[in-house]
């Protein structure tokens, strides 16, 4: 068996080549994180990891065309989601607002890093117009991290929610937010103006792995965001998601689930982490379906109103069905 743990990491880009305004992906993005990624032997994907390839179906192409026409982004494309073919083919998408350059460098994520562009004042109207044109009954709106904004982007979320409700009143709205770190109280106050139907913020992984997987984020802060929002809006469902396969233990995942319930989170998603490229964190385990089933059973025992748990589950995958299962729609 080949041991790749001693393989030197690729050389960092020369300082003179660094352009903070450019969108950095893969090696360019992860080269500057505090904990370097050390390659390990790539695990063979088991038979239960099956992804439907993106196709050239008319609905798939229609959605991509409309998105480009309105200068919109989806996390499905930017984060290289494995379910993009199925979701686009069924006419669903998770819209990513505030640009396609994130101020964070999370090494599990394939969204590009860089100095963000100014907010697009037309984006809320373009987003709402697109949702109305596609006749979507349920949408997920997420964003890159915008640590450059005083409100973390909360005001832009509110503008998008208002425009969607104006142009497509029957559409239910889930927002998947960044952590608003350093500006949480301000962000929550702003969100009071137009709360969503579902408030989602992902913990992503267990606290022991935060420094490696989520540099710039804080586990306790993310829990506080969810709890504080729920205290302000007890009738709005709260939701969070986790990845497995990064080196966490079963007991650690169960403890995170207990932490979420202790912070009044209603809905849960758990899915298998898949490495976007060799420059991202490696997959350390492909979790067996029996373990996913155990997590699902434990989630309902703990009191979650809905738990979507499985290898190919993602936070916004079949979000409409998740919300329906939780009694939201």
Curated annotation (Swiss-Prot):
Keyword Cytoplasm: yes
Protein name per UniProt: Lipoyl synthase
Entry EC number(s): 2.8.1.8
Designated gene of the protein: lipA
GO molecular function, one term: lipoate synthase activity
Binding site for [4Fe-4S] cluster 1: 76, 81, 87, 316
Binding site for [4Fe-4S] cluster 2: 102, 106, 109
Cofactor requirements of the protein: [4Fe-4S] cluster
Lineage: Bacteria, Pseudomonadati, Pseudomonadota, Betaproteobacteria, Burkholderiales
Species assigned in the record: Burkholderia thailandensis (strain ATCC 700388 / DSM 13276 / CCUG 48851 / CIP 106301 / E264)
